[in-house]
């Protein structure tokens, strides 16, 4: 008889282990999501199969807004259901990340997003989990900050955090450079025929100089050949390694210019050769971008940091400054610029947006492409119109996407994903 009761108790334990959907149904902040799951058995089944994951779930108003937007774009949503499923996968973080584990030291956590159409990172696309000013955030593509508005709830199959806005899928290198107004380097990649080395390979780290860094040596690009410019651009791309801010320690790394660059730390600040690291951890779909003060020179690969110099000494001798952004002829200028993240590896100060904006990190701004306001060509070139500025207008999930229209990219909530499940 005792054995019978033991078996019954074990059976009950297995039978009544809660699923994700059951846990969600008990959270008032997720009642909209719960209601929709009950109406969408296929989506509910997919979610309930997840184990040992951390779910970043949209709170009610955000969920409701995105469901409404999705229903208003049925034809477009249907044709891009794979994109929406990709966003859903991106909001499922591998492993257990409760509130106590999210600290001021950033975590670069792999997610369930492994679809080769959207990511080319071996571990699965990364989301950054970090505490800032007493609040916890999930930081995604284009430096989009989603606030965790309810501390993580430990449930049977993982952890549930409630967030106030959906994550943004990391974009390609070139789309991200444009959104951040790092357009001189974007121009260097294009004119140097190095775009494929930036956008296509798996697991890269790219050090993008600010536009002001190009201006400081603008005459170096007058009449430069495509081959020489490509060598310079390729020297900024580390092969086969995704180096997040904690990895920016003393070491040499191979680049697509077939020369090593050297990372060093001085007084808690990171340098690449002699260039100062000014912004870190801008996620892209095949790795990460860090912003540096100046252009690296593959023919001066022994350049060393000069910590007391501000600005750092340029790596190009005999080059003179120009007053406009070099290499930006034909590069569309965004009408607004995403604010860049600050330095999270220690050091002093933080990054500004694209070298021109001083706006602090905030919800992703809308990124609109336009042909006006471009900078000059080969050297300083002709001046453009007024430069883009940062805006803090909240546009959850907005992104300058290539695989899907920006309008659809803004309709990126878990709710929309579930519509197409």
Curated annotation (Swiss-Prot):
Chain residues in the propeptide: 398-421
Bias kind Low complexity: ranges: 388-401
Region forming the signal peptide: 1-17
Record key words, sorted: Cell membrane, Glycoprotein, GPI-anchor, Lipoprotein, Membrane, Repeat, Signal
Topology in the lipid bilayer: Lipid-anchor; GPI-anchor
Residues modified by glycosylation: 52, 75, 80, 120, 145, 181, 223, 300
A single Gene Ontology CC term: fungal-type vacuole membrane
GO biological process, one term: macroautophagy
Compartment(s): Cell membrane
Chain residues carrying a lipid of type GPI-anchor amidated glycine: 397
Function: May be a cell surface adhesion protein.
Name of the molecule in the record: Fasciclin-like arabinogalactan protein ARB_02922
Organism listed in the record: Arthroderma benhamiae (strain ATCC MYA-4681 / CBS 112371)
């Amino acid at each position: 008889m005792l054995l019978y009761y033991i078996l019954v108790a074990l059976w009950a334990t297995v039978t009544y282990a809660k699923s994700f959907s059951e846990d969600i149904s008990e959270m008032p902040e997720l009642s909209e999501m719960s209601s929709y799951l009950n109406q969408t058995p296929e989506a509910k089944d997919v979610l309930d199969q997840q184990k040992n994951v951390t779910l970043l779930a949209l709170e009610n108003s955000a969920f409701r807004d995105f469901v409404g937007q999705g229903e208003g774009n049925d034809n477009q949503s249907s044709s891009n259901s794979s994109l929406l499923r990709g966003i859903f996968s991106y909001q499922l973080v591998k492993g257990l990340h409760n509130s106590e584990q999210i600290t001021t030291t950033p975590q670069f956590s792999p997610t369930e997003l492994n679809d080769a159409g959207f990511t080319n990172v071996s571990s699965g696309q990364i989301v950054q989990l970090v505490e800032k000013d007493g609040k916890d955030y999930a930081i995604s593509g284009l430096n989009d900050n989603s606030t965790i508005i309810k501390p993580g709830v430990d449930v049977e199959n993982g952890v549930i955090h409630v967030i106030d806005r959906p994550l943004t899928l990391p974009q390609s290198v070139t789309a991200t450079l444009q959104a951040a107004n790092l357009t001189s380097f974007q121009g260097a990649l294009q004119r140097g025929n190095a775009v494929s080395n930036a956008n296509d390979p798996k697991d890269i780290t790219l050090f993008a100089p600010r536009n002001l860094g190009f201006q400081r040596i603008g005459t170096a690009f007058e009449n430069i050949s495509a081959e020489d410019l490509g060598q310079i651009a390729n020297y900024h791309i580390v092969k086969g390694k995704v180096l997040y801010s904690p990895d920016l320690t003393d070491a040499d790394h191979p680049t697509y210019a077939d020369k090593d660059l050297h990372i060093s730390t001085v007084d808690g600040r990171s340098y690449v050769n002699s260039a100062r690291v000014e912004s870190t951890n801008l996620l892209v779909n095949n790795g990460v971008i860090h912003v540096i003060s100046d252009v690296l020179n593959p023919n001066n690969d022994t350049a060393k940091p000069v910590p007391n110099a501000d600005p750092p000494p340029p790596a190009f001798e005999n080059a003179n400054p120009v007053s406009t952004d070099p290499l930006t002829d034909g590069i569309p200028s965004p009408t607004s610029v995403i604010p860049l993240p600050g330095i999270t590896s220690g050091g002093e100060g933080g990054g500004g947006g694209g070298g021109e904006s001083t706006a602090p990190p905030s919800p992703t701004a809308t990124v609109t492409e336009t042909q006006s306001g471009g900078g000059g060509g080969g050297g300083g070139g002709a001046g453009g119109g007024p430069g883009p500025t940062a805006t803090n207008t909240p546009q959850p999930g907005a992104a300058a996407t290539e695989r899907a229209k920006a309008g659809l990219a803004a309709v990126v909530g878990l709710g929309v994903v579930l519509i197409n499940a």
